[in-house]
């Protein structure tokens, strides 16, 4: 049977330019995803206005850098602020790393909040959800829908990389996503609890090499903030 293709024009279907979804339509889809995932409610509380340095010690120092935990956090905060401020004028990627609960996810939420407020398309995934989406996209009939968001959003945030079940598919898809977004000059933020020296073993040398040469490494240090909040009565 001869397969027919119908290209919908802008006049035929609102939200489309030719056969492609227009920016406003993509943003509406992303807005719906945020509403369904409850992330919009989270971002009301987790943004730059609510970032606190009180959870970071101003006496504990990193011997290698000579910085206290609080100074390290302030440096990360300033980098995140600069990332948002210069987002439209420069291409940059961030790699947030450090132990569990030191504020990596909170900081990425701060960035997501401000860029969404300025009408940018931001896709935010836990590593598990991202690779599940890519697997569904790869093995479903509509192979491009998931990748469209992953490759084309203004900013892609991959949270908690290393907590997913890692296999050859995950490793190859991570490299593909990172490389494709670099080629398209689309910014990406990755957060992970993995130590840098273990990253290549978990994924691959070429993936870490691509990250090391194209991402700004941002470390956060300190005690688990979630545990601190429990002792402080949730404050």
Task: Tell me the role of every PLM-derived stretch.
Residues 29-79:
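Charged, amphipathic alpha-helical linker segments immediately N-terminal to NTP-binding catalytic cores
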Residues 160-161:
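Walker B catalytic acidic pair
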Residues 82-91:
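Phosphate-binding P-loop
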Residues 90-108:
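Walker A/P-loop nucleotide-binding motif
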Residues 61-78, 91-97, 113-152, 165-168:
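Short glycine-rich substrate-engagement loop in P-loop NTPases that contacts/grips substrate
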Residues 155-157, 189:
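Structural motif
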Residues 1-46:
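Interdomain "pre-motor" coupling segment immediately N-terminal to P-loop NTPase/helicase cores
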């Amino acid at each position: 049977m001869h397969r027919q293709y119908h290209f919908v024009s802008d006049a035929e279907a609102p939200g489309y330019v030719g056969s492609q979804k227009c920016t406003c339509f993509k943003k509406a889809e992303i807005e719906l995803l945020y509403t369904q995932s409850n992330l919009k409610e989270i971002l009301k509380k987790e943004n730059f206005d609510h970032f606190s340095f009180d959870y970071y010690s101003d006496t504990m120092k990193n011997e290698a850098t000579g910085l206290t935990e609080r100074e390290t956090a302030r440096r990360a905060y300033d980098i995140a602020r600069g990332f948002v401020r210069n987002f439209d004028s420069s291409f940059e990627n961030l790699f947030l790393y450090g132990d569990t609960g030191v504020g990596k996810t909170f900081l990425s939420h701060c960035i997501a909040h401000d860029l969404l407020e300025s009408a940018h398309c931001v896709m935010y995934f836990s590593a598990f959800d991202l690779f599940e989406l890519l697997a569904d996209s790869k093995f479903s009939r509509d192979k491009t829908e998931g990748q469209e968001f992953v490759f084309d959003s203004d900013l892609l945030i991959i949270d908690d990389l290393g907590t997913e079940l890692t296999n050859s598919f995950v490793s190859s898809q991570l490299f593909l996503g990172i490389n494709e977004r670099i080629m398209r000059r689309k910014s990406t933020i990755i957060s992970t609890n993995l130590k840098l020296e273990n990253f290549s073993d978990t994924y691959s040398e070429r993936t870490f090499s691509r990250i090391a040469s194209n991402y700004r490494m941002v470390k956060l240090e300190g005690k688990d903030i979630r545990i601190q909040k429990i002792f402080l009565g949730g404050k």
